[in-house]
Amino acid sequence: MTHDPKPVKAPFWTPGTLVMLAFMAAGALTLVFRYTFGLGGVTNLNNHYPWGIWIGLDVASGVALAAGGFTTAFLAHILGRHYYEAVTRPALLTAALGYTFVAIAVFVDIGRSWAIWKPIFYQNHTSALFEVAMCVMTYVTVLWIEFIPVLAERLGSRIPLLAFLDRILDKTMWIFIILGVVLSCMHQSSLGTLLVIAPTKVSPLWYTPMLPLLFLTSAFAVGYPMVIAETTIATSSLRLESEMNVLSPLSRFTILTLGVYMALKLGDLIMRGAYATLLDGSPQSNSFLVEMGLGVVVPWFMLLFGTVRRSRRLLFAAALMIVGGVMLNRFNVFVVSFKAPYATEPYYPAIGEILVTAGAVATIFFLYRLFVTWFPVLSARRQEV
Amino acid sequence: MKVSRRVFLGNLGALGAAAAVPDNARAWESKAPPAPYGCLVDLTRCVGCRKCEQACNEVNKLPEPEMPFDDLTVMDRLRRPDHRSYTVVNRYYTGRLDDRDRLAPTFVKVQCMHCQDPACVSACITGALTKKENGTVHYDVEKCIGCRYCMAACPFEIPAYEYHEPITPRVRKCTFCYERVEQEGKLPGCASICPVEAITFGRRNDLLGQAHARIDNDPAKYVDHVYGENEVGGTSWLYLSGVSFAKVGFHEMPTEPMPKVTETIQSTMFSYLWSPIALFAALGALMGFTSRRSRSKEDDHDA
Ligand code: SF4
Ligand code: SF4
Ligand code: SF4
């Protein structure tokens, strides 16, 4: 094995972590208001716009950006390309943290948080949301199970239970790895099914019965760029070696996955004739142009060049654009494109909604740093031959 | 261990192949009850007295209104049903003149349409919303988790939410006076009170017959369209109008039921969980194959 994950030896308390603490505090305070005055107290949601950025960003984008977890697991463990194992642990950690926060976001967003367990017993099988909920619930569990060996490596000697679980998992891990990929494929696509039930509300630029397939393929496409972006951020902020020897070849797969997504998406747009409104200057069409142009087409062309794939800066830029493009796509589908014909006023996220979202992002960064400092997640630095 | 795992994966593959024959051949079918109740609202008769709003408020024990029900100035602005009122009457001036050449208003009562194949029912994660045999789209607060997917799904934007309840908010909408109709054999509150019989309660099929008869008997008075007959696959509440529906707040709707596409996708992909099982088997086989290959490579190196 070429990789050897170790806890990172870097000081934990930095100006960065303190800033994150401040955001976390602001978000937590907003939650106090949420549970005192109701959703109406801190959000701009109304009867026509029942879903805002907590669903559009925290849940939908969050799920998409955790795709690094199952795409790297597929490559390294199922396809057996062990060379890429150096990035599976950080991707797994990001996915586990990401999904945990998706679950928390749902918990906060639903009006009856205490009833969150009810879909397990009251099941409505025609509901795409039911399927998303079941998969996400199971997948969070699977992710933390997959993470147990990492915890055991560090704490196994002190917590016998961890060591015990680790030994059982040694033989059964393949089940969870495959299960993780299957569950991801299921709910990534069902997330796209959600708004297919509202054809009169979703702008024709995004509304298509193909939404599930587009969500699935874009999740495939964003997986490795997400790994590239987060590894670059982590290695540079923790002053580790860049891991370009893994990231460069990883980016080659994205030419294919992003290319497939681009072809499907553009093909669908042309087949439906929806491109007609593309240049009308509306917020919808502008947002669509940014999403497709800067988020898909430009980075795809960039990745075609070996110089881009080998340059740390350029590769990071391309990966960041793809990540931003898929995030914007989810935001567009759930927020920008959603127009309620009977609504008297549009929806804009309230300051309270923004604070909670920012607090959640800060908490993820904070915990990521905490985990890589304590546990053997990153293998950079001693990984070079 | 390794060998047994391969055998297991092989069995799994067979299982997957068997499950991979989905029974998605059957097309989507409407789940609408055959003879539901309905209400026919004749906009040419409505005088905008707000008595239906008041009756609805009393029958459903809703909170005191902000402005009394005999105050007609509330109609100066368009309203929507909300968590305190399941129905509202709006006033539109469409340029139509009365017999004394003054601008004549058209009054439109708005409430849940009780769709035949309701988007809200299909979408609800827990089945808190159900379509009853008598046509009612019924809400069960005990199952609701407050996800508001029903609200995102409803094409008429009807379900309202108690946004200022921190812990136990409810989804609120016209109940079609379910208990009153089903258990007490009475008319819905609004239909029973209307002084000019603008609201007719009955079996949906009978109401459609009546509606078309009224149009046929007086084609000059009505536009030739019963709103709700085909909109979103049909609704239990039906409307007749003397002016274009588009001018009095009715949006054009597809005639396909809203849940058709999503339910077709869901059942095609997930009936008997065939696709996840098949995918699991395929990935298992792939993993078994690659791990055997890499092992044999290692063996070569060792040798
Ligand atoms: S009008 Fe809306 S809330 Fe009423 S039954 Fe139809 S979809 Fe459901
Ligand atoms: S808010 Fe309640 S009734 Fe509406 S979809 Fe969610 S669980 Fe169902
Ligand atoms: S049917 Fe009942 S709940 Fe619905 S508007 Fe009429 S009175 Fe109100």
What are these model-predicted stretches?
Chain A
Residues 6-13, 17, 21-27, 81-83, ...:
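Long, contiguous internal "core" modules enriched in hydrophobic/ aromatic residues
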Residues 32-57, 108-130, 189-212, 239-242, ...:
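Membrane-interface interhelical loops and short amphipathic "cap" helices
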Residues 20-28, 96-103, 178-179, 317-326:
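Hydrophobic alpha-helical membrane-insertion segments
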Residues 63-71, 222, 292-299, 363:
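Hydrophobic alpha-helical transmembrane segments
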Residues 1-68, 72, 338, 365, ...:
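N-terminal signal-anchor module of multipass membrane proteins
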Residues 306, 310-385:
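TerminUS-proximal long segments
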Residues 34-44, 49-52, 59-159, 173-188:
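Transmembrane-helix bundle segments that line or gate the permeation/cavity pathway
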Residues 101, 185-186, 261-264, 321-331:
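Aromatic-anchored segments of alpha-helical transmembrane domains
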